[in-house]
Design a protein with these regions (language model features):
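P-loop (Walker A) phosphate-binding loop of NTP-binding proteins
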Residues: 10
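Hydrophobic anchor at the beta1->P-loop junction of P-loop NTPases
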Residues: 7
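ATP-dependent small-molecule kinase phosphotransfer cores
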Residues: 32-92
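The feature captures the helix immediately C-terminal to the Walker
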Residues: 19-20
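Conserved phosphate-donor/acceptor-positioning beta-strand/loop module used by diverse small-molecule
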Residues: 86-90, 100-124
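Small-molecule kinase domains that catalyze NTP-dependent phosphoryl transfer to phosphate-bearing small molecules
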Residues: 125-156
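Post-Walker A helix-loop "phosphate-sensing" segment adjacent to the P-loop in P-loop NTPases
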Residues: 24-31
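Walker A/P-loop
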Residues: 15-16
Length: 156
């Protein structure tokens, strides 16, 4: 049995939906740090630990992985990764994990059709953010294949 579950997927793929369902069933989510502002309905310590950019610069040594996406920093602390069993990572974040940590993880790749993602992204972002996110995701997920299972269910 693998020790960690890692959810990976582009914007609007259902990562938070799956995370919440798994937490309801007893999984312990490792909350990431971010420098971006909270979205409507997000809560400190539940969805993210919201910190300013100076926090990331002065605390680099606490992170197991640290990535930048659309000018915002994201990272999982070593402490969270050592005691939790459910995570959301980007392909770059997954790739930056030590091999032994990746080998001990089961990666779920959420990959619904782009039109489904666009609809979901428009519900939470303005049009410019949606287009920018789609372009960034296309680059980030180009030839991504480091997963154990891929879910493409449109109703997910």
């Amino acid at each position: 049995m693998r020790g960690k579950i890692i959810i990976v997927g582009p914007g609007g793929s259902g990562k938070d939906f799956l995370r919440k369902k798994m937490v309801e069933r007893g999984f312990d989510y490792g909350v990431s740090f971010t420098s971006r502002p909270p979205r409507e309905g997000e809560k400190e310590g539940i969805d993210y630990y919201y910190r300013d950019i100076n926090f990331f610069e002065s605390n680099k040594n606490i992170f197991l992985e640290l990535q930048e996406f659309n000018e915002w920093k994201y990272g999982i602390s070593k402490g969270e990764f050592s005691i939790k069993n459910l995570f959301i990572l980007s392909p770059a974040g997954l790739k930056s994990l030590p091999k032994s940590f990746r080998d001990d993880s089961f990666v779920i790749y959420l990959n619904p059709a782009e039109d489904t993602r666009v609809k979901r992204l428009k519900e939470r972002n303005d049009a410019d953010d949606v287009e920018r996110r789609l372009i960034a995701d296309q680059k980030d997920f180009f030839e991504f294949s480091d997963y154990d299972i891929m879910i493409t269910n449109e109703d997910f």
